[in-house]
A protein has these predicted regions:
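A structural signal for multi-pass alpha-helical bundles of membrane permease subunits
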Residues: 8-275
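Short, Lys/Arg-rich, polar N-terminal cytosolic tail immediately upstream
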Residues: 1-6
């Protein structure tokens, strides 16, 4: 190996190492704080948990109602992601494969929704949910999550589906497949990498969503995990130890999902480039 190549590899490894430390250090710090009490953290913010208080997780799950918040987040996010996958893939398939007069108008209308900041839609969504009796309900929050993530889901899937060769669809039609048959038997199997990408991105984004949830949910028994964590941070109460425990409970599912599906995510994000 030439000296220049060795130098480039050393520089690349150094950059990756620095990034890993910068990205991982805050997570490690929160993990250590999650095993310490607030008084211990106040006395030594960067101290090692000795002894580690593992019982804090059980207490957070039951006494602090994190179990309820976790269930609410799971129901809302999973239902929203399922709806996004079905509706987004069908819409992307329709606009990618079938050309009609207003095809591009619909495309740019959906794409433009990605550009606008979410604060612009909060008031209108609040009024719609109140009007239809969906304010302060899990269903209402789930529908809002579908609305805010659908443009990005559609954009990713449409770009992938549009690159599927037309010959595949012609062959499926010759074999007797209906329009829905083409979608279920051809588009979905081929588009699995892109669909997996949208599922992971939507899970991560919606699991950590706070802005819409804090406006649209008022009852404590309907709070999501981000709202539940904020209960321990206020003017009269600041339980840093329990906040750290709640943060670890919140991020563990995201870490597990990414660990198991990261290969599909990378493959899906690069598939359209390699086509």
């Amino acid at each position: 190996m030439r000296p220049a190549d060795v130098g480039r590899q050393a520089a690349l490894l150094s950059a990756v190492s620095v990034y890993t430390v910068l990205a991982g250090a805050p997570v490690l710090w929160v993990a250590m704080m999650s095993l310490r009490t607030t008084s211990e953290i106040s006395a030594a913010p960067y101290g090692w948990p000795s002894p580690p208080h593992w019982g804090k997780y059980a207490s957070a799950w039951t006494t602090s109602h994190y179990g309820t918040y976790f269930w609410n987040s799971t129901v809302i996010v999973v239902s929203a992601v399922l709806a996004l996958t079905v509706v987004g893939s069908m819409a992307a398939h329709a606009l990618a494969r079938y050309r009609f007069r207003s095809n591009r108008v619909v495309y740019f209308a959906l794409f433009s929704a990605i550009i606008f900041p979410p604060q612009l839609t909060i008031i209108s969504l609040f009024q719609v949910l109140v009007e239809y009796g969906l304010f302060n309900t899990r269903l209402g929050v789930s529908l809002v999550y579908v609305a805010i993530q659908l443009p990005l889901t559609f954009y990713i899937l449409e770009g992938f589906f549009a690159r599927i060769p037309q010959d595949y669809f012609d062959a499926a039609k010759i074999d007797g497949c209906s329009e829905m048959g083409v979608f279920w038997r051809l588009t979905l199997p081929i588009g699995t990498p892109a669909i997996a990408t949208t599922v992971i991105l939507n899970l991560i984004e919606l699991w950590n969503e706070f802005l819409y949830a804090v406006v649209l949910v008022t009852d404590d028994d309907k709070r999501t995990l981000p709202l539940g964590i904020m209960r321990f941070l206020g003017d009269k109460l600041e339980d840093i130890g329990m906040i750290a425990t709640g943060m670890m409970i919140a991020i563990l599912p995201v870490i597990l999902v990414y660990a198991f599906l990261s290969e599909r995510l990378i493959r899906g994000m690069t598939a359209s480039v390699l086509k």
